[in-house]
Amino acid sequence: MYQQHIFYFITGGIFILWILAHSFFVKIIYLWASGCLLWYCLETRTFENKNNLGTSEPFLVNPAIFQKRARQLALSKLLLRQPLYPGIPEISEEIESIISHFMQKYIKVWSYQIIPEPTISNSIESHLRKCLMVLLSRVDEIDLADVLVKTVLPLITKHLRLFVEAEQLVVGNKAVSFTDHSELSREVAAKYDHGRLHEAVLLSGNPMVAQKRYLRNWTTQVLSIILPNYYETSPLVLSLVTEVIINTTLLPLVSYISDPDFFNYLIIQASGSIIQRRRKIRRLKRAIRKQSNHFQVGARRLRLKDSQHSFEQYIHEIKKISNISDARRLRSELMVQRRQLEQTEAFDFEFKQYRERLQIAIITAEKRISLLSGTPFQHKEAVLFEQVQSLLQILSDSAAVSCFLEFMERKNRSRYLHFWLVVEGLKESQDDPLNAHMIAPFSDIVSDHTDFTAIVKSYFESVDNPLDIPKPLTNTINKFVNQSKDNLNPDLWVEARNAMLMAQEHVFDIMQNSDYSEFVNSEIYYRFLAQDVVSDHKSTNSSATFSRLEELGENIPAISKQPSYLSISSSSKSINSSPSPSIQLSVSSSISRDKNLSPLDLELDDPTYSDEEEVLFAPPGDLQLSESIDELNNNIEELKAQLNAINTLIKKAELVADQKQLKSLTKNHQEIEKAIHRKERQRDQYMSQEEDSKLFNRSRVSIDSFKISKEENTPDFAVYTIRIERLENGHVRSGWMVARRYREFAELHKQLKQTYPGVRSLKFPQKSIITSLNKNVLEYRRGALEEYLQSLFRMPEVCDSKMLRMFLSQQNITAPQMFNPKEVGKKWKQLLEVLGFEVNNSFNASNVNTNSSFSGPISEFLVELFSPNDDAKQQWLPKKTYISILEQLFGGALEKRIRLQLFQLFTPEKIYRKLREFRRGLEGKSNHDHSKDRRHSRARKPAYADRNQLKAEAGILLASMFPGYTPDIAVKRIFRILQNQSLNAHVIYTLLDEILLALKKHARSTNKAT
C-alpha cells in the first residue's frame, strides 16, 4: 500500500510537469498513458475488495428466523376452509360454491398475473370468509321483523313525506313543463329535505367519485368492527379487500337497485298475471251488463280519464234512473266529487273538462229528481254550494249540529260545544232563558245545584282540557255550588244562573271566532249541504230550536263517552216543561252504540236474555284467563258508567212524572244491571280458575307423537302432538292436547331467548333441511322438543310468561286471514264509510292506546301513503286519528301475520333454494358471450319506453295490493318515487348508515359485556 502511494505521487508530479513543459502531441501521448495507469490501479483495488467479501458474515444468522419465514411462505399457498354456516351444511356448501366462483372470476384473473402463486387470492379469500362468518353468526341474532318495521319502515315513511313536499315545491300551484323526466327528477332531488341529500349523492359533477369515497370509508369501518385482528392485518391486504368489496359488490349493487328500471321490471313481472285476470273480469262484466237490464245506475264513478263515449253512456244511465232515492244519492256523490276537485289545483285541460262534465252530470241528476218527484225543475246548485248559515242557525238544526260536533271532535275542541248544549238544555223560556228572575220552588234550586256542580267538575275543574271561562263568572258559580244543599241562598242561585248564561255566550263567541269559519269551509259542512238535510222551514222560535237540540243532546254522550256529560245534559233536559220522547230513543241509541264499541255487551239487545244464563266455565286448556279477566273488568266499568247515566235520567223523569219515559229508562236500567251481574259472575268464575291454570309445579308436559300433514300448494310437514296434564297430589286431574309445528317451537324459543336469558342455555334442536320426512329424524326431533318443553316447565318465570301460555293454550286460534287484499279492502272501506257518515257512533280517539310499538310505524306509513296533499285543516280526519283507527283495526294480528310471513320467507329450505338459483345464474351467465348480454339489454330496453303503459301496470299492481278505497294516490306517489334514481340512491345510502350504526352499537354492547 505504501509503494502504491509513492507511485501515485510520482505519477501525479510527472503529469503536472508535462502539462507545463511539453507540446500538444506529447501531452496526448502522456494523457493516454496516465489513463491506462489509472485503470490498472482501480481494477486492482476492486479485485482485492471482492476477495474480502468471502470473509464477511451471512445476513441470516439465526436459523429460527429462516424457518419461520419459510413456514409463512408455505402457509400462504394453502387455505384452510371452514364451514361458513355449520348449522345447515347444504346452505354452507352453496355459499362455498358462490365464493369459489367469485374468486375465480374477479380475483384470480389478475392476481396470478402479478404472482403466479395463490398467495394474494388466498389472503383475500381468507379475510372475506372471516367477514362472512361473523355476519352470518350475527344474522341469527337479528329480529328481522323489528328491523324492517321499526327501523327501515320509518325511513321509508320519512322519505315519502319529504318527496311529496319537494314535489310540491317544484310543481307549485301551477303547471310546470319539463322537457325531460330526468330534469324534473333533478329538480325534485334538489328540493328534497331543503337540499340535504346524503353525502354520497351528488347532483352535479361526477357522482361516482363521491360514491366510491363513501363506500370506501363505510367498508373500512365495517371491516374494523367485524374482522378479527383487524389492526394486525397487512394494510396492503386490507386495501385489496376493501377495493374488491366496493368495485365487485357494493357499487354495482347500489347502482342496480337504485336504477328505476329495476323497479319497473319488478312491476312488469308482478303485474303480468294480474293484467290478464283483469281483462277476463272486464269481459265478464261487460257480458253480464249486456244481459241485465236493471243494473244499478251510478255504480261507477265519473273519472278524469273517461272518454267521450263513456261520459255519454254515463249521462244515459242517469236518465234511466227510476228511483228518486238513487237519483239523490248519485247527485250527492257528484257534488262531493266536484267539491274535491275544487280543493285541488287544476294543472291542465283535463281538469277543466272533468269539471264541466261533473256540472253536466249534476244538472242531469237534478232534472231526473225533478221529474221523479213531480216538481218543476229549478237549478239550485249555486244556492246549495254558496249557502252559508250563521253559527246560531247551525246550532239550531240537529243535523247541522251533528256535523259541527264531528268537526269539533276532530279538532279536540268538542268540550266547548258540549258545554254550550248543556247550558242550552237548562233554558226554559224564550223571554227569560234561564228563568233567572223568578223564585222557583226549592226543588228547582236543588236541581240546579246538582247540575251546576256537575258542570263545574266536568268543564271548569277539568285538568285535561279546561274551558277558558273568565274568573269572575266561575267564582260566582262556585259560590253557589259550594253551598250546602240544606241551606241554599236564592240570591246566589240567581247570580249563578246569570253567570252560567254569560259563560255560555262567552263560549259561543269563542266558537264563532275560532271554529266557525273553518267549519263552513270544511268538507263536513259541504257533505251536510249535499245530503238534502237542510230544512226549508227552519223556525225562528227558540222553543222549537231547543227541542231539536234536545234530540241531539242525547246523542252526544255516545260519541264522547263521558259519563259526566251524559248525566249533566240528560238531567238538564228533564227540567223542561215538555219533555221530549226522543230521550227514550237516544238512551237506547247510546246503549247500542256502546255495545258496538264493546263486543261483549251484545247480549243487551237479546230479548231472551235472563239473569239465569249459564256462566261459562273455562276449560283446562284455557291458559289466557288473565287477559279475559282484564277484558271483563273494562267492560264492567263501561257498563257502570252507563248505569250512572241512566240513574240520573230516571231521577229527572220522576220529577216531571213522565211515566212512558220512566218505564223505558227502568227497562234499560234492568238490562244493564243484568249485564253487569253476569259479567261479574263470569269474572269471579275466571278468577277462581286462574290460580288452577298455573303451570309451574302443577302440570307436566310430553309430546306423545307426530303426524305428517299437508296443506294446499305446500309440501308435507310434521305436526307434533303435545299433551299437558294437570296434577293434584301426584295424580292426573285433567289435561288437554295441542298440535304445533316445528316452526312454532322455533318462534317460541326465539321470543323466550330475548326475554329470559336462562332459556339460552337450554338445548333446542337446530334447523336443518329435511329433503324427505324421515321418521328417524322426526322421532329424534320429537324427543329433543319434549326435553326442551320439560326444561321450560322447571323455570317458574317462563311458566308464567304470556308467550308460553299462548303456545300451550287450546284457545290460541290462528288469527283470521285479514291480509287477503279483497278482505282488507272490504273491511277498510266499511270502516271508512262508518267514520265518514256515522263517526259519532263508532270511534273515540281518546280511548285508543297509541303506544303500539309494532303497528304504529305501519299505520303511519299507510296514512302518509294515502293521505291527501291538502292542508291539515281540510283533511277528513287528523292523522293521529287515522293511526289510532288502523291500530285498532289491525291490532296484534298484524304483527303475528308479518312475523309469520317473514318466517315462511326465510325458512332454510327457501334460503337454500334461492342460493342455488343464484349460483346457477352466476354459472350460466359466465358461460354466455358478453355480446349476447348487450344485445339482450338493447332488446329489453324498449319495454320501459312506454311510460303510460308502465304507469297503468303499476296502478293495476298497487290497486290489487290496496283495493277498495281510491288507491290512485298511492299508485302515483309510489311510481313517481321509484323513478327518481338520485333519491333511490339516497335511501340506500341512508340504510347503509343505519347498518353501520347498528354494528357499532352491537360492538359496544359486546365490549361492555366482556
UniProtKB/Swiss-Prot annotation:
It is a single-pass membrane protein. Residues 88-274 form the PXA domain. Residues 622-692 form a coiled coil. The chain crosses the membrane at residues 6-26. GO terms for molecular function: phosphatidylinositol binding. Residues 698-815 form the PX domain. GO terms for biological process: protein transport; vacuole-ER tethering. PROSITE patterns: PX, PXA, RGS. Residues 923-932 have a biased composition (Basic and acidic residues). Residues 923-944 are annotated as: Disordered. Pfam families: PX, PXA, RGS. GO terms for cellular component: endoplasmic reticulum-vacuole membrane contact site; intracellular membrane-bounded organelle; membrane; nucleus-vacuole junction; vacuole. Residues 390-529 form the RGS domain. Gene3D superfamilies: Phox-like domain (3.30.1520.10), Regulator of G-protein Signalling 4, domain 2 (1.10.167.10). SMART domains: PX (SM00312), PXA (SM00313), RGS (SM00315). Its main location: membrane. It is found in: Membrane. Keywords: Coiled coil, Membrane, Protein transport, Transmembrane, Transmembrane helix, Transport. Belongs to the sorting nexin family. This is Sorting nexin-12. It comes from Schizosaccharomyces pombe (strain 972 / ATCC 24843) (Fission yeast). The lineage of its organism: Eukaryota, Fungi, Dikarya, Ascomycota, Taphrinomycotina. The gene is snx12.
